[in-house]
């Protein structure tokens, strides 16, 4: 049996007593987890205790900071860039909206370093899709940074940067339930963007995740839940918690706020990675349906707001124009060509 630091048992005891950890305590715990220094049985107990108690913003921020501190380095640029990402796990199996939106946003002139992984609940996560487009998931950090500089978009595949997460995998797979790891992915982009649009699988997470981002020093961000989706919705209302200079502003958006009509959720259903590749190719070359195009455009529109373009209707039209011109699809091919 491995020898574990007494501090880890003290932290575990707090969790068993349903007491919240400080950000520092959470950092210490997750630092040990990522280094493989926590026995799987104890790991199972602390993840479950955290889940039943309910993870606080300080605990999530501490865990995220530990994972970032242990991540492989990425040469972050001085200029402003963003991530657009969902937790996944909403169970809706829609097309890959945030991945598609990353290319469209880049075609609109902003920079996006997207952090992602293979599918959790959908048949096709962002990495599954990019794989089908021939984009190299194992791109070196330097090559990815070059793509961000030159194309305005790059993709950082989580396992390439966060190898320590593997220590928690057997426990997560055995537990078969959501744990804190399900919300950590979008918060541990190794490029450390200061701007982020993050979708969450449950509306109860919107405010806590926004508070987590404030604790992590995020400059301008929005956390959204769209009527069951971890994206801005075109089939109903979207709850938004926007962060501006450390303050959180909560509001609701409808498709009309973007100048669009409402579409049924069925209109943006996805499939296997190969089917999704065909759908996304259509969307990025201006051949998608109005619903598909709209679903991507509203997410790009809110991301552009985080860069200071406040007019959502104008942003939506700009995003639609980037799809119809084929400019966004060119970026997919250029990223694939970098190898």
Swiss-Prot record:
<dbReference type="InterPro" id="IPR000312">
    <property type="entry name" value="Glycosyl_Trfase_fam3"/>
</dbReference>
<dbReference type="Pfam" id="PF02885">
    <property type="entry name" value="Glycos_trans_3N"/>
</dbReference>
<comment type="function">
    <text>Catalyzes the transfer of the phosphoribosyl group of 5-phosphorylribose-1-pyrophosphate (PRPP) to anthranilate to yield N-(5'-phosphoribosyl)-anthranilate (PRA).</text>
</comment>
<feature type="binding site">
    <location>
        <begin position="89"/>
        <end position="90"/>
    </location>
    <ligand>
        <name>5-phospho-alpha-D-ribose 1-diphosphate</name>
    </ligand>
</feature>
<keyword id="KW-0479">Metal-binding</keyword>
<dbReference type="InterPro" id="IPR035902">
    <property type="entry name" value="Nuc_phospho_transferase"/>
</dbReference>
<dbReference type="InterPro" id="IPR005940">
    <property type="entry name" value="Anthranilate_Pribosyl_Tfrase"/>
</dbReference>
<dbReference type="InterPro" id="IPR036320">
    <property type="entry name" value="Glycosyl_Trfase_fam3_N_dom_sf"/>
</dbReference>
<dbReference type="GO" id="GO:0004048">
    <property type="term" value="F:anthranilate phosphoribosyltransferase activity"/>
</dbReference>
<comment type="subunit">
    <text>Homodimer.</text>
</comment>
<keyword id="KW-0460">Magnesium</keyword>
<dbReference type="GO" id="GO:0000287">
    <property type="term" value="F:magnesium ion binding"/>
</dbReference>
<dbReference type="GO" id="GO:0005829">
    <property type="term" value="C:cytosol"/>
</dbReference>
<feature type="binding site">
    <location>
        <position position="230"/>
    </location>
    <ligand>
        <name>Mg(2+) 2</name>
    </ligand>
</feature>
<feature type="binding site">
    <location>
        <position position="231"/>
    </location>
    <ligand>
        <name>Mg(2+) 1</name>
    </ligand>
</feature>
<feature type="binding site">
    <location>
        <position position="126"/>
    </location>
    <ligand>
        <name>5-phospho-alpha-D-ribose 1-diphosphate</name>
    </ligand>
</feature>
<feature type="binding site">
    <location>
        <position position="98"/>
    </location>
    <ligand>
        <name>Mg(2+) 1</name>
    </ligand>
</feature>
<feature type="binding site">
    <location>
        <position position="231"/>
    </location>
    <ligand>
        <name>Mg(2+) 2</name>
    </ligand>
</feature>
<comment type="similarity">
    <text>Belongs to the anthranilate phosphoribosyltransferase family.</text>
</comment>
<protein>
    <recommendedName>
        <fullName>Anthranilate phosphoribosyltransferase</fullName>
        <ecNumber>2.4.2.18</ecNumber>
    </recommendedName>
</protein>
<keyword id="KW-0028">Amino-acid biosynthesis</keyword>
<keyword id="KW-0328">Glycosyltransferase</keyword>
<feature type="binding site">
    <location>
        <begin position="96"/>
        <end position="99"/>
    </location>
    <ligand>
        <name>5-phospho-alpha-D-ribose 1-diphosphate</name>
    </ligand>
</feature>
<feature type="binding site">
    <location>
        <position position="117"/>
    </location>
    <ligand>
        <name>anthranilate 1</name>
    </ligand>
</feature>
<dbReference type="Pfam" id="PF00591">
    <property type="entry name" value="Glycos_transf_3"/>
</dbReference>
<feature type="binding site">
    <location>
        <position position="86"/>
    </location>
    <ligand>
        <name>anthranilate 1</name>
    </ligand>
</feature>
<dbReference type="GO" id="GO:0000162">
    <property type="term" value="P:L-tryptophan biosynthetic process"/>
</dbReference>
<feature type="binding site">
    <location>
        <position position="172"/>
    </location>
    <ligand>
        <name>anthranilate 2</name>
    </ligand>
</feature>
<keyword id="KW-0808">Transferase</keyword>
<feature type="binding site">
    <location>
        <position position="94"/>
    </location>
    <ligand>
        <name>5-phospho-alpha-D-ribose 1-diphosphate</name>
    </ligand>
</feature>
<feature type="binding site">
    <location>
        <position position="86"/>
    </location>
    <ligand>
        <name>5-phospho-alpha-D-ribose 1-diphosphate</name>
    </ligand>
</feature>
<dbReference type="InterPro" id="IPR017459">
    <property type="entry name" value="Glycosyl_Trfase_fam3_N_dom"/>
</dbReference>
<keyword id="KW-0822">Tryptophan biosynthesis</keyword>
<keyword id="KW-0057">Aromatic amino acid biosynthesis</keyword>
<comment type="pathway">
    <text>Amino-acid biosynthesis; L-tryptophan biosynthesis; L-tryptophan from chorismate: step 2/5.</text>
</comment>
<feature type="binding site">
    <location>
        <begin position="114"/>
        <end position="122"/>
    </location>
    <ligand>
        <name>5-phospho-alpha-D-ribose 1-diphosphate</name>
    </ligand>
</feature>
């Amino acid at each position: 049996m491995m020898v574990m630091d007494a501090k880890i048992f003290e932290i575990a005891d707090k969790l068993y007593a349903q007491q919240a950890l400080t950000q520092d305590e959470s950092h210490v715990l997750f630092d040990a987890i990522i280094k493989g220094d926590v026995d799987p049985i104890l790991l199972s107990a602390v993840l479950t205790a955290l889940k039943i108690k309910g993870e606080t913003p300080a605990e999530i921020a501490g865990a995220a900071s530990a994972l970032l501190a242990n991540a492989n380095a990425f040469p972050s640029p001085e200029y402003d860039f963003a991530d657009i990402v969902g937790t996944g796990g909403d169970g809706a199996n829609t097309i890959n909206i945030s991945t598609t939106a990353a290319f469209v946003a880049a075609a609109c002139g902003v920079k996006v370093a997207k952090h992602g992984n293979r599918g959790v609940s959908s048949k096709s996560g962002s990495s599954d899709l990019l794989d089908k487009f021939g984009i190299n998931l194992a791109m070196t950090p330097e090559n990815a940074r070059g793509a961000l500089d030159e194309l305005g978009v790059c993709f950082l595949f989580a396992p390439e940067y966060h190898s320590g997460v593997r220590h928690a995998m057997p426990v997560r797979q055995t537990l078969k339930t959501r744990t804190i790891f399900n919300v950590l992915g979008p918060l541990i982009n190794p490029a450390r963007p200061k701007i982020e649009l993050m979708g969450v699988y449950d509306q109860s997470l919107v405010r806590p995740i926004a508070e987590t981002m404030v604790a992590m020093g995020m400059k301008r961000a929005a956390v959204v839940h769209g009527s069951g989706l971890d994206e801005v919705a075109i089939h109903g209302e979207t709850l938004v918690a926007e962060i501006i200079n450390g303050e959180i502003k909560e509001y609701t958006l409808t498709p009309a706020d973007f100048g669009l009509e409402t579409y049924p959720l069925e209109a943006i259903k996805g499939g296997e990675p190969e089917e999704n590749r065909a759908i996304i190719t259509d969307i990025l070359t201006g051949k998608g349906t109005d619903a598909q195009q709209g679903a991507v455009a509203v997410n790009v529109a809110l991301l552009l707001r985080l860069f200071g373009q406040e007019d959502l209707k104008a942003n939506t039209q700009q995003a639609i124009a980037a799809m119809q011109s084929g400019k966004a699809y060119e970026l997919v091919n250029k990223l694939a060509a970098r190898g």
